[in-house]
Amino acid sequence: GFGSFLGKALKAALKIGANALGGSPQQ
């Protein structure tokens, strides 16, 4: 569903943001 897509997009954005800041991605 659309909610699942938003969840995946949000997690991907957080990973990219963490990598951009030089931090390790949290799981």
UniProtKB/Swiss-Prot annotation:
Keywords: Amphibian defense peptide, Antimicrobial, Secreted. Antimicrobial peptide. One of its GO terms (cellular component) is extracellular region. The keyword Secreted applies. Expressed by the skin glands. It comes from Xenopus ruwenzoriensis. This is Caerulein precursor fragment R4. It comes from the Eukaryota. GO terms for biological process: defense response. The keyword Transferase does not apply. Belongs to the gastrin/cholecystokinin family. Its main location: secreted. It is found in: Secreted.
